[in-house]
Amino acid sequence: MTTYGIGTQTPEQALDSLSDMTTDLTPIQNDEFHARIAKAQAYMQANNIDAIYLNAGTNLAYFTGMRWYASERLVGAILPAKGDVQYIAPFFEIGSLNDFMVIDGPIRGWQEHENPYQLCVEVLSEMGISKTGTLGIDESAQFFIYDGINKANGNYNIVNAQCVTAHCRMHKSANELALMQRAMDMTLEVHKATASMLYEGITTTEVEAFIKKAHQKVGAPGNYFCIVLF
């Protein structure tokens, strides 16, 4: 009777069967971040978009390499159609942003009593962007960011920046495809190893703990999202 690879070894044996699968991979390098920025700027120039605001989160990370979670405080970057990116953040976060910075650029800080949206308008003006220019807002940005910028200057032609971000992100580089494929390969190996150590009476928390260890064994930091249900 076949077991389809389920319950054929102990958890220790299953972990021992795994090894680091990331040693031959090349992480996204600075030149690729610069290429992403250049691609976005070329699209912006061709479509008459003067600048885009990148909010903390996936788009900020994709174009600048800076990993920062969105919160109730404005943290992001302004990418003009021509010129260098500039970051905007609470003044007290500037040191931390410098620690996480991958693509260099000035950080414009705002104090708690100041209006961060007015600072955005000032930065755009310093970039040479007219107060009637076209500004793309990150599609993942909270409404209060759009609202704040619009109140600081109601003359902008504000558009959804998704036309820029999606245009860039949906077309993957060879290195991106290799990283994505390896991530899927790693996940599949973890699934196989997990199936192989299942036994009658095992709990969901034990399986979840194994999955975390298995991901670490193949070279990942651990689980990003894991739910085990029987």
Each predicted region: which residue ranges?
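Short, structural beta-strand-to-alpha-helix junction motif
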Residues: 142, 199-210
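Acidic, glycine-rich loop-and-beta core segments that form the ion-binding/anion-interacting portion
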Residues: 210-230
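Hydrophobic pocket-lining residues that define ligand/cofactor binding sites across diverse proteins
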Residues: 44, 198, 215
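Active-site pocket-lining segments that scaffold enzyme catalytic pockets across diverse folds
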Residues: 187-194, 212
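A composition/biophysics-driven feature that prefers long, compositionally simple stretches
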Residues: 1-189
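Conserved short loop/turn motifs at secondary-structure junctions
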Residues: 134-138, 194-203
